[in-house]
Amino acid sequence: MAVKKRTTLRDKHAKSNTKSNLSGKIAELKEENNGQESDYHENPFLKLSKVTKKDKQLNKSQNFSQKFDSSTLNTSSNISKSALRRRKRNARNELKPKMDELLQNLPETTNVIDPSAAAHKPNDHKSTKFIKSTKASANLPNATKQTGHAKIMTQESKNFTNVLKNPQFRSSPFSALKDAIAQNIQNQ
């Protein structure tokens, strides 16, 4: 099994240039010959097409290569691949925002130092306190899934038994519920 040779755009472009030169000369010769022939034919429906299939294909490929060459940057064989890459990289870098322009456009600010923070010494370990996070636990069970629903039910049954065992609830159930609801609201 033979390995197919890969062709690059450069190779295709070079081949099309040589083909276009040959096809241009062939087309000129055909035009000269056609000019000498008479246009009269007995049956015009039997008259053969003057443009062959190969010529149509060549014209189509030439038109495409011309459009392709005009749309791209200079991809002629005179420019190296590294130079093309460098030009593209520089064009991309020009589109990126520059930090100098950003710093010029930002308003200037003065450093405001809080007097209470300035009094705090960084080496003072005795005054540091544990700060409890206010973020809610992200590991709560999902009530829409079966396992999460089961976990919630076990937690609620434990809470229910704890509430029933609570002496405050036994003495006045409504005041205990009111306190529990207020406590839940504060926790949230």
Swiss-Prot record:
InterPro entries: Slx9-like. Residues 59-81 have a biased composition (Polar residues). It comes from the Eukaryota. Residues 27-44 have a biased composition (Basic and acidic residues). It is found in: Nucleus, Nucleolus. This is Ribosome biogenesis protein SLX9. One of its GO terms (cellular component) is 90S preribosome. Residues 1-89 are annotated as: Disordered. GO terms for biological process: maturation of SSU-rRNA from tricistronic rRNA transcript (SSU-rRNA, 5.8S rRNA, LSU-rRNA). Keywords: Nucleus, Ribosome biogenesis, rRNA processing. Involved in ribosome biogenesis. Required for normal pre-rRNA processing in internal transcribed spacer 1 (ITS1). May be involved in the movements of the replication forks. The keyword Plastid does not apply. Interacts with the 35S, 23S and 20S pre-rRNAs and with the U3 snoRNA. Belongs to the SLX9 family. Residues 1-16 have a biased composition (Basic residues).
